[in-house]
Amino acid sequence: MSGGGPSGGGPGGSGRARTSSFAEPGGGGGGGGGGPGGSASGPGGTGGGKASVGAMGGGVGASSSGGGPSGSGGGGSGGPGAGTSFPPPGVKLGRDSGKVTTVVATLGQGPERSQEVAYTDIKVIGNGSFGVVYQARLAETRELVAIKKVLQDKRFKNRELQIMRKLDHCNIVRLRYFFYSSGEKKDELYLNLVLEYVPETVYRVARHFTKAKLIIPIIYVKVYMYQLFRSLAYIHSQGVCHRDIKPQNLLVDPDTAVLKLCDFGSAKQLVRGEPNVSYICSRYYRAPELIFGATDYTSSIDVWSAGCVLAELLLGQPIFPGDSGVDQLVEIIKVLGTPTREQIREMNPNYTEFKFPQIKAHPWTKVFKSRTPPEAIALCSSLLEYTPSSRLSPLEACAHSFFDELRSLGTQLPNNRPLPPLFNFSPGELSIQPSLNAILIPPHLRSPSGPATLTSSSQALTETQTGQDWQAPDATPTLTNSS
């Protein structure tokens, strides 16, 4: 499936023709990519031109997105193990390759500890301007992993690596190891991120239903979106903004419905008062303040993007399929109406004198199909707000009534499997917005001491299933690159 925005494309009922398929966004800088494993063919967008690793799973969406090179960040230099190349010369990157590759790698989490790691069955599963993604199998455990190989600027620490090393959550793809390797050119250094392998993406799952002319079952929409919001609540509590939320970066296991957020190549620790590039995030999912050129934005840009993903799953197509940066704003205005002067000021004060055509908001009930649950529409409208501070927080989204079915005892997946772990909250998660805990923790999991605490069995579930060691966000981030 080729990339780029569909021709036409206003939301249902707004007067412009729309395609019926899930379109791969054009994204930033470069042209839009194809579907997973596809080729680029869409129109260019607004952004910095970093191809998305849509993901470490069954395929790699090559849509481009904003953000600087993944090798941006604070000072520092490359690490150990740079004397060898990966894959080694002569290794056949085919499906049947039995060649074993051994590298000295550092554990992804915890103290820096190196060990030998052996791989086999190496094959390319995606590439882009960021580098290459391989699939491999750990020789010792036979576990599949994805290896993201990116060119490392020796002058900087790699921001993606620094962020991945501090994240530990059941809804975020885990960094197993990392190692450095040399390139073909002199002094060329590559960083290799060894990540857990997850077979599918929300993009591919949704496209499967669309191709079959089916609507994705609402229970999957609930399970996927809930886990996305939970992952956002966690990274935002760590001071990290993802800055490239889209269906291609949401990995899912089609059997268990576990979702994991991936591709932190555009992510950044946001610090109040420090400027950030607005040329970020794939076009269809860009918050309006980014289109307005804001540099003091907050993590609420991720919430807008998540709202776009929710709307896309409900509609079966992107809700704001802009053909360019300016057209992206037009698509948003066609649904939300012209922003008020105050809303514009909240997004970027420099635009308050700009004259916009006055367009009335399109009723949300007419944007979506008649059978769309009212709670889903209500949640969408609370996420897709012009004013960044008016959007729900990720945990407020988790507590929304749209997800009440997930908190009901006995709810199962359509394949009769149990729901994935949804309530194995760590103490850190429960401390983000404690006032919501009475809603977030289902009645059957509450302890007798009160609704804000989990039962001991649930607490054990937390410890065994997440392995989280939550900590407050760093007061003084070590990453100093201003992008």
From Swiss-Prot:
Summary of activators and inhibitors of this protein: Activated by phosphorylation at Tyr-279. In response to insulin, inhibited by phosphorylation at Ser-21 by PKB/AKT1; phosphorylation at this site causes a conformational change, preventing access of substrates to the active site. Inhibited by lithium.
GO cellular component: axon; cytoplasm; cytosol; microtubule; mitochondrion; nucleus
Binding site for ATP: 125-133, 148
Residue numbers bearing the N-acetylserine modification: 2
Keywords: Acetylation, ATP-binding, Carbohydrate metabolism, Glycogen metabolism, Kinase, Neurogenesis, Nucleotide-binding, Phosphoprotein, Serine/threonine-protein kinase, Signal transduction inhibitor, Transferase, Wnt signaling pathway
Catalytic activity: L-seryl-[tau protein] + ATP = O-phospho-L-seryl-[tau protein] + ADP + H(+); L-threonyl-[tau protein] + ATP = O-phospho-L-threonyl-[tau protein] + ADP + H(+); L-seryl-[protein] + ATP = O-phospho-L-seryl-[protein] + ADP + H(+); L-threonyl-[protein] + ATP = O-phospho-L-threonyl-[protein] + ADP + H(+)
Polar residues bias locations: 450-469
Keyword Acetylation in annotation: yes
Phosphoserine modified-residue sites: 2, 21, 72, 77, 97
Domain Protein kinase: 119-403
Further details from the record: Simultaneous silencing of GSK3A and GSK3B by RNAi stimulates replication and promotes survival of INS-1E pancreatic beta cells.
Family label: Belongs to the protein kinase superfamily. CMGC Ser/Thr protein kinase family. GSK-3 subfamily.
UniProt subunit comment: Monomer. Interacts with ARRB2, AXIN1 and CTNNB1/beta-catenin. Interacts with CTNND2. Interacts with LMBR1L. Interacts with DDX3X. Interacts with TNFRSF10B.
Name listed for the protein in its UniProt record: Glycogen synthase kinase-3 alpha
Species this chain originates from: Rattus norvegicus (Rat)
